[in-house]
């Protein structure tokens, strides 16, 4: 019996961007934190914004044609890390968890950021996101000092060198 059909796409139509806004709202609602400090509403209104190529990227994960997950990266222009980007908005809808989509999305973002010429990827995550922190560690991310202000208690800041060896999800 074949598994689900998983595709990663880059939104390129008005309908795709509307689906992106919907899943990003699901992401924000799943956090139980206020993302106003990140300008979240402006981000949604201005999509693709900083996620536009060539410096950024937004991916949607489709499972049997349904939008199941998302993830993005954008240039990180103001940090202590040269030639870095930031992974943002990695999320898989609960009904689609356990397919390995988080890993597929994260690894695809890292690969595409490497292809875009970045040498490092940074991100922040929260204490209660234990599964996500384990995923990031397995992909080579390590804790670093804060690279921007996050007022949410328990924020962790992580960095991975791009182009470094990472175990492949596909074997």
PLM region descriptions:
Residues 7, 119-139, 143-171:
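C-terminal "cap" of GNAT-fold acetyltransferases
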Residues 14-17, 99, 130:
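Loop/helix-junction capping segments adjacent to catalytic residues or to phosphate/diphosphate-binding pockets
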Residues 106, 113-124:
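Conserved GNAT acetyl-CoA-binding A-motif
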Residues 93-99, 127-128:
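Active-site acidic-Proline motif in GNAT/NAT acetyltransferases
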Residues 8-88, 93-94, 106-108, 112, ...:
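Acetyl-CoA-dependent GNAT
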């Amino acid at each position: 019996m074949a598994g689900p059909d998983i595709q990663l796409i880059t939104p390129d139509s008005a309908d795709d961007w509307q689906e992106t806004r919907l899943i990003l709202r699901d992401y924000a609602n799943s956090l139980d934190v206020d993302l106003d400090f990140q300008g979240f509403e402006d981000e949604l209104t201005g999509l693709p914004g900083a996620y536009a190529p060539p410096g950024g990227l937004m991916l949607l994960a489709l499972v049997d044609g349904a939008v199941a997950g998302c993830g993005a990266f954008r240039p990180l222009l103001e940090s202590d890390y040269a030639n870095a980007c930031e992974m943002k908005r990695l999320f898989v809808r609960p009904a689609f968890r356990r397919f390995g989509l988080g890993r597929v999305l994260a690894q695809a973002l890292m690969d595409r950021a490497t292809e875009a010429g970045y040498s490092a990827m940074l991100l922040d995550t929260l204490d209660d996101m234990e599964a996500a922190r384990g995923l990031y560690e397995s992909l080579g991310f390590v804790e670093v000092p804060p690279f921007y202000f996050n007022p949410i208690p328990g924020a962790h800041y992580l960095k991975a060198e791009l182009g470094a060896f990472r175990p492949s999800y596909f074997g």
